[in-house]
């Protein structure tokens, strides 16, 4: 039986898709529909070369998925015919889902219930699931939750110091994100170190436009920087990360900002975009560090925050840390950021290998610290699509 899986990731205004062989990891098709719901809605994909097409003004997730089926897959009927399952990335599963699940009515309800914590993403996931059912009526759908990996966190890590009934009655707690990526990196480190996953102790830095750190002890998440939502934690592309909560009251009461304006500011106008007042693109920050004040300011704050988190998470390791790992678009490609962060952790006996660090980009992987470094640091390319495909194949019985 074929182990080809269609992997879908429906964002608020995007649809990322791939056809992945769950057995070999080979990607037979990859693509991205973006600007959904807007006049410039378009799709880019790779299948026997690179392609691009306009989807039509206002095209949304349903139209994008239909285009993928009726135009792209129609050009490769054998690819569509060999699909065995569909795996959906789900941003938030609340406390209900500790692992991936075959999608049933109960699972759909759980995704809907968790939408209160991910109001932009979970509703889009539900649209994608329904569209997939229509276009692929014979295939089983599997939900793979970003939050599931973090359900092993102890109470001391996931509770906020708020009235306890807010957790008991309303589920207000730390959930974390990027769990699929953190899980993949944990497995990769186990392979690299030739030890069981259950013995791996790492601090993984998933750095992209969204970013999070995860403390992983004995192969399980014990703490992570994102919280109830993806807004908490590190400085990100447009998200503020950690701030004094009273800033919200000051913005509202003293400066006259509406709740909607504050929400928009913290999620879409802060982070690197806010600090530079120019762009959320980390490449601008890196390229202009030391030359432009706004770039220098943003990079210093970004690296300081990240180094603080990494240092703090050593408290969860109980005396043994196998590695500090970097992944995600920034983590895999920004040598200067990795070096700045690791240099701030010199108290742990970490020594960066400058040459190895420079080589580890654009798909290059490996250890970026010297042989004398007490704790190794590694760059590892993440592959969330493969984890989703593997779980979908397993649960669908492929």
Curated annotation (Swiss-Prot):
Transmembrane parts of this sequence: none
Compartments, as annotated in UniProt: Cytoplasm
Top EC group: transferase
InterPro entries reported in the protein's UniProt record: Ac/propionate_kinase, Aliphatic_acid_kin_short-chain, Aliphatic_acid_kinase_CS, ATPase_NBD
Biological role: Catalyzes the formation of acetyl phosphate from acetate and ATP. Can also catalyze the reverse reaction.
E.C. number(s) listed in UniProt: 2.7.2.1
Active site: 146
Protein name: Acetate kinase
Note describing how the cofactor binds: Mg(2+). Can also accept Mn(2+).
């Amino acid at each position: 039986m074929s182990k080809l899986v269609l992997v879908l990731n429906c964002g608020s205004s995007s649809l990322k898709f791939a056809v992945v062989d769950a057995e070999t990891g080979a990607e037979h098709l990859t693509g991205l529909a973006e600007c959904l719901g807007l006049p410039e809605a378009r799709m880019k994909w790779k299948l026997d070369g690179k392609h691009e097409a306009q989807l039509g003004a206002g095209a949304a997730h349903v139209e994008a998925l239909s285009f993928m089926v009726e135009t792209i897959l129609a050009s490769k009927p054998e690819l569509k015919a060999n699909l065995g399952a569909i795996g959906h990335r789900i941003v938030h599963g609340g406390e209900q889902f500790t692992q991936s699940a075959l999608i049933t009515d109960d699972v759909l309800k759980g995704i809907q219930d968790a939408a209160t914590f991910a109001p932009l993403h979970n509703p889009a996931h539900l649209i994608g699931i329904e569209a997939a059912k229509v276009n692929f009526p014979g295939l089983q759908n599997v939900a793979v939750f970003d939050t599931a990996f973090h359900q092993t966190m102890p109470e001391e890590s996931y509770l906020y110091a708020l009235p306890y009934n807010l957790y008991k009655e309303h589920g207000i707690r730390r959930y974390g994100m990027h769990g699929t990526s953190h899980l993949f990196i944990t497995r990769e480190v186990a392979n690299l170190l030739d030890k069981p996953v259950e013995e791996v102790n790492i601090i993984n830095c998933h750095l992209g436009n969204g970013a999070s750190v995860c403390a992983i002890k004995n192969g399980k998440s014990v703490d992570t920087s994102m919280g109830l939502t993806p807004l908490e934690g590190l400085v990100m592309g447009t998200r503020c990360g950690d701030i004094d909560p009273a800033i919200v009251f000051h913005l509202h009461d003293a400066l006259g900002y509406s709740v909607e304006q504050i929400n928009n500011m913290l999620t879409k106008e802060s982070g690197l975009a806010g600090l530079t007042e120019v762009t959320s693109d980390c490449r601008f920050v890196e390229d202009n560090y030391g030359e432009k004040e706004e770039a220098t300011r943003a990079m210093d704050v970004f690296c300081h925050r990240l180094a603080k988190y990494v240092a703090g998470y050593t408290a969860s390791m109980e005396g043994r840390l196998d590695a500090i790992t970097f992944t995600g678009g920034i983590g895999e490609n920004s040598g200067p950021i990795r070096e700045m962060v690791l240099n701030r952790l010199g108290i742990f006996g970490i020594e960066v290998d400058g040459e190895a660090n420079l080589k580890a980009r654009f798909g290059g992987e490996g250890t970026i610290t010297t042989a004398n470094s007490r704790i190794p640091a590694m760059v590892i390319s993440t592959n969330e699509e493969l984890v989703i495909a593997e779980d979908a194949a397993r649960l669908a019985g492929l």
